Amino acid sequence: MNGKLGAVLALLLVSAALSQGRTLVKMGNELRCQCISTHSKFIHPKSIQDVKLTPSGPHCKNVEIIATLKDGREVCLDPTAPWVQLIVKALMAKAQLNSDAPL
């Protein structure tokens, strides 16, 4: 099961690499949305190095999911895209497993 989940996550991450979503240049610690557009086309998980999830809040009304690709580009992912939702679900499950692990 973990192998399949990893493969799906990797597949999703690579698809993020091909994304057309862009992030705003981060200027200090400004309280505003970081994504000016989002990408919904699939990115293969092998192309994704990291994924950052920012919940909505006073800084931005949108949930923002920013994937850092292996080439260093940052891509804003569409949180409503089914493949992006799978990535988020996998990350949350992994975080839950890590938090349940004994010290």
From Swiss-Prot:
Give a GO molecular function annotation for the protein: CXCR chemokine receptor binding
Q: What is its main location?
A: secreted
The record's section on InterPro entries has: Chemokine_b/g/d, Chemokine_CXC, Chemokine_CXC_CS, Chemokine_IL8-like_dom, CXC_Chemokine_domain, Interleukin_8-like_sf
**Pfam families named among the record's database cross-references:** IL8
Which residues form each disulfide bond in the chain?
33-60, 35-76
Q: Which CDD domains match?
A: Chemokine_CXC
Name a single GO cellular component.
extracellular space
PROSITE patterns associated with the record: SMALL_CYTOKINES_CXC
Q: Does the keyword ATP-binding apply?
A: no
Location in the cell reads: Secreted
Q: Which UniProt keywords apply?
A: Chemotaxis, Cytokine, Disulfide bond, Growth factor, Secreted, Signal
Q: What induces it?
A: By serum. Expressed constitutively in Rous sarcoma virus (RSV) infected cells.
What function does this protein fulfil? May be an autocrine factor that promotes the growth of fibroblasts and is involved in the neoplastic transformation of fibroblasts by v-Src. Chemotactic for peripheral blood mononuclear cells as well as for heterophils.
Record protein name field: Interleukin-8
Q: Which organism is it from?
A: Gallus gallus (Chicken)
